Design a protein with these regions (language model features):
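Vicinal oxygen chelate
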Residues: 4-13, 36, 59-151
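Short, flexible, glycine-rich and Lys/Arg-enriched loop motifs at helix boundaries
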Residues: 50-63, 129-131
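Core segments of cupin and vicinal oxygen chelate
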Residues: 2, 9-54
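N-terminal beta-strand motif that seeds the catalytic metal site of vicinal oxygen chelate
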Residues: 1-17, 69-74, 126-151
Length: 151
């Protein structure tokens, strides 16, 4: 298996409502047979009916849980971008679960949940610089820790 993710599919209760929410945040996509495909760099974010997704995965469909054990993250290049995106999400109807603040890792982040309770962390992490195209490469943590210990 190649180490990459091609799609992240979010099970939603109302595809049209979810599409409108993400469009208010600047995402653009295509809807095909009640499924929305949003380009996200080199991968796709997919919005699909929660019940249909459960059937497709061979899982039981129940009511949306409070915490699913999954968090999505969107890294940005500056602290002001975190504030702007969190404000835009709130304006689009999201619930802010953690207001933007300094993090334990020296960054700055806030968290919102979308209209279907999917958690999104919006973060500026100086230890994870973004390339010009927005891609992220995991740093060599060994050299980062060594550098932090050097006076």
């Amino acid at each position: 298996m190649e180490p990459r993710i091609s799609l992240v599919t979010l099970g939603v209760t109302d595809v049209a409502r979810a599409k409108a929410f993400y469009e208010q945040l600047g995402w653009r996509g295509q809807e095909v047979e009640q499924t929305v495909f949003l380009q996200a760099g080199g991968m796709a974010l997919v919005l699909w009916g929660r019940d249909k997704l459960a059937v497709d995965l061979g899982l039981e469909h129940g009511s949306p849980p409070g915490f699913t054990g999954v968090a999505l993250a969107h890294n940005v290049r500056s602290q002001p971008e975190v504030d702007e995106i969190i404000a835009a999400a709130q304006g689009a109807g999201a619930t802010i679960t953690r207001s933007p603040s300094t993090t334990f890792y020296g960054g700055y982040a806030g968290v919102f949940v979308d209209l279907d309770s999917h958690a999104w962390e919006i973060a500026h992490n100086p230890g994870f610089p973004l390339a010009e195209d927005g891609s992220l490469t995991i740093p060599d943590f060994g050299s980062v820790q060594t550098a932090k210990r050097t006076p």
